[in-house]
Amino acid sequence: MPKIKTHRGAAKRFSKTGTGKIKRSHAFTSHILTSKTRKNKRNLRKGAIVEAVDHKNIAKLIPYM
């Protein structure tokens, strides 16, 4: 069997932690920021962990990370 290819778009958007969880960044941070509060923009800078229902599908896209 050949190796599974890594989905390059997913590889740029997600990374794995040391414990095997998948990290992601928040959306809504690139433009139209004037209507968002300072607190909202600050919280959007923080990373987030992928939810359990999505973990299996994303893990298939990035098998070697």
From Swiss-Prot:
InterPro entries: Ribosomal_bL35, Ribosomal_bL35-like, Ribosomal_bL35_CS, Ribosomal_bL35_sf
GO biological process: translation
Family: Belongs to the bacterial ribosomal protein bL35 family.
UniProt biased composition (Basic residues): 1-26
MF annotations from Gene Ontology: structural constituent of ribosome
PROSITE patterns: RIBOSOMAL_L35 (PS00936)
Domain of life: Bacteria
Descriptive protein name: Large ribosomal subunit protein bL35
Any one cellular-component term (Gene Ontology): cytosolic large ribosomal subunit
Underlying gene: rpmI
SUPFAM superfamilies attached to this UniProt entry: L35p-like
